[in-house]
Amino acid sequence: MKYREIILNIPKEIAEDFTTFLDEIGVAGYYEILFDREVPRAPHEEIISDDTKFRVYLAQEDNENETKILIYLKANAGEVFFSESRWIETKEYEEAYKEFYKPFIVGSYRVIPTWEKDTALGTTPEGIFPLFINPGLAFGTGHHETTRLVLGRMGNLSLSGKKVVDVGTGSGILSVAAAKSGASPILAVDVDPNSVRSASFNRDENDISSEVLAVEEGGFDHEKIQGQTWDLLIANITFAVLKANIQKIVSIKTDHFLFSGVITERLEEFLELLKNEVGGEGVFFQEDTGWELIEWKRKG
């Protein structure tokens, strides 16, 4: 089977809305390329570019979505975007992201692609947890600012023996990190079946049992999420999805939340939403190139 690969350079400020749009029209897959270096950007470093690069994949029989994408970008980015496209085979589609995915350290973790497991493991510093990840077509390489923000904060939390739920798990990287830090049991859920398969694969690659880390299809209204009590809820999900699910979030039995996926322009609106609907207060905040991490505690 062939796929249409569209390579896009678009303004960073429309990236969140663009990913929401791609989800709505139902493309075969996409990912955002941010950087591919070993050492994360230091806080004092300047942002290299105001643009971000996407690779979007369309199934061979999909004759409409490329036009929809270009119309969307014309309307929202004007002339400030670049695109090119080509036909690729299934193997290229599944392997394309490997070109941009290298081992790197964030906080207490070193994210290692599964195909570099044997060579990179021996060079992992002592005291750093290795996370073996093959993102496939699921979100969560660890390169995205939102994922790095959560990983960085998780390394400063005491997770041993804690009961954790990860909503919108993507590749499962955050759940794997929680397990490596001693959390158990963990429930990772995602509405995308590809993500469920990817997260399950990565769990197994890290020799984590299904008793410690269960991966299931679902969202905030998942029966197990709503029916149990949790020490920590992790949600690396866009503001639009968080806002749409706020009442489901309110009903989850936990007093401790880690949210990411919120852009700086929406931060105040999101904090007001949490204050009015969830209650409690923010206890830790961090920003990375226009993306926000919010650690929130509800008063028990």
From Swiss-Prot:
Enzyme Commission numbers on file: 2.1.1.-
Compartments, as annotated in UniProt: Cytoplasm
Keywords of this entry: Cytoplasm, Methyltransferase, S-adenosyl-L-methionine, Transferase
Database matches in InterPro entries: Ribosomal_L11_MeTrfase_PrmA, Ribosomal_PrmA_MeTrfase, SAM-dependent_MTases_sf
Cross-referenced Pfam families: PrmA
Top-rank EC class of the record's enzyme: transferase
Alphabetical GO biological process terms: methylation
GO cellular component, one term: cytoplasm
GO MF terms held by the record: protein-lysine N-methyltransferase activity
Domain of life, source organism: Bacteria
First and last residue of the signal peptide: none
UniProt-annotated binding residues for S-adenosyl-L-methionine: 147, 168, 190, 236
Catalytic reaction list: L-lysyl-[protein] + 3 S-adenosyl-L-methionine = N(6),N(6),N(6)-trimethyl-L-lysyl-[protein] + 3 S-adenosyl-L-homocysteine + 3 H(+)
Role noted for this protein: Methylates ribosomal protein L11.
Family according to the record: Belongs to the methyltransferase superfamily. PrmA family.
HAMAP family: Methyltr_PrmA (MF_00735)
Protein name, entry field: Ribosomal protein L11 methyltransferase
Species of origin: Leptospira borgpetersenii serovar Hardjo-bovis (strain JB197)
